[in-house]
């Protein structure tokens, strides 16, 4: 299940969520919150929901930051990286043995952040032109918030891609890497699971391509009219 636009907007729980989570727990359903957001750790997400009145164990959260750290560690153990992102991403990378390096890193890794600026772009472009590889936590162009739709990871990465001529590798949904990890954490096969999300271009296509049943909610980014633009 996705989080932003499905479970909450900002710090506001969406209608019906409490009843849905109560049903999952009462029926002993295996579930995982699979979020493309890389800003917070699973513990921080757990505490955020607790403040809204939902008590859910930390083990029920998996983020694109964790997926990105796992991918980098599998590609190049003990790699170094210049990171554009929030503490949730930096912490996940540290835990995977990836060190920070703003001189000659193996990777430039980008996620959501509130500290993004022109100097960040200049630094990333310079490092990539010198040989660093560009990785992004997810391909979401926009995301829902209490203020409305806001720029997300891909909107921050696009200027770097355009300036370098390099295309980032996006680890989060709809990348099957993240979906397969989610299934392993749940201990189920794809035909036994469903993906609930608010985005046709990430959540729903990820579920389809991984063989899951899919459920689109209209409380986030995708509207009923938007659905007509997709062939699936």
Locate the predicted segments by residue:
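Asp-based, Mg2+/Mn2+-dependent phosphohydrolase catalytic module
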Residues: 1-29, 38-62, 69-232
